[in-house]
């Protein structure tokens, strides 16, 4: 509902109807739509942080681990339940909930920055400013939700693999041997049209 109508235009009754619940049942779990938005963002960030932790425990080349993190990030962002534009609407949350999300988001950004810095230290990445590189990656990944079409010809997984490959090649050292990701972009029948969506 947040994807289709936007947070401000979506009411609890709309969400209940879409979920096949009565408003009373929905209110049993959430006191308002801001709690639903918080749940979506908090759960998404937990998945992203788990991806960072997993990648940092591995011993393989940093570009390969970075690819794993970025691809996973985008699949979370494009998830029908936890992702979409809901992840970008932090300002819609009450201050107490927003602060919790911002702290967790900052932890994730710091983890991504540390991974890029590790690649630089090992000579596998070229990024004079790892913080800037990490933020540029996050900007590209997060903006994808504004043009991705779930009914389009490419799945979230395919988009995630392709975008991650582009971004990793932007920081990978020329001497680093990165095995290209083979993508089989299966064309699916689109229920909508529009050149700006994929």
Go through the PLM ranges and name each one.
Residues 4-8, 59, 80, 122:
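Short coil/turn segments at alpha/beta junctions that flank glycine-rich nucleotide-binding fingerprints
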Residues 39, 53-79, 133-137, 181, ...:
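Hydrophobic alpha-helical connector segments
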Residues 49, 67, 71, 109-117, ...:
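An amphipathic alpha-helix signature
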Residues 1-35, 39:
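Helix-turn-helix
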Residues 43-49, 79, 96-121, 131-135:
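Amphipathic alpha-helical packing segments from all-alpha helical-bundle domains
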Residues 12, 34, 38, 42, ...:
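Short, structured helix-loop boundary elements
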Residues 30, 88-93:
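Short helix-capping/turn signature of helix-turn-helix
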Residues 84-89, 98-102, 120-166, 174-188, ...:
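Hydrophobic/aromatic-rich alpha-helical bundle segments in the mid-to-C-terminal region
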């Amino acid at each position: 509902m947040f994807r289709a109508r936007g947070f401000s235009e979506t009411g609890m009754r709309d969400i209940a109807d879409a979920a096949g619940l009565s408003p009373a049942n929905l209110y049993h779990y959430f006191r308002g739509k801001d709690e639903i938005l918080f749940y979506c963002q908090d759960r998404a960030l937990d998945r992203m942080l788990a991806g960072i932790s997993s990648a940092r425990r591995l011993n393989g080349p940093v570009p390969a681990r970075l690819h794993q993190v970025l691809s996973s990030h985008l699949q979370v962002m494009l998830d029908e339940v936890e992702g979409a534009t809901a992840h970008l609407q932090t300002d819609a949350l009450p201050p107490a909930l927003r602060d919790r999300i911002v702290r967790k988001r900052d932890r994730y950004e710091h983890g991504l920055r540390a991974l890029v810095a590790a690649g630089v230290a090992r000579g596998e990445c070229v990024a004079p400013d790892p913080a800037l590189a990490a933020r540029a990656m996050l900007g590209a990944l997060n903006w994808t939700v504004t043009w991705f079409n779930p009914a389009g010809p490419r799945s979230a997984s395919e988009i995630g693999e392709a975008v991650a490959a582009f971004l990793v090649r932007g920081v990978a050292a020329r001497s680093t041997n990165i095995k290209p990701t083979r993508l089989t972009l299966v064309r699916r029948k689109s229920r909508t049209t529009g050149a700006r969506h994929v």
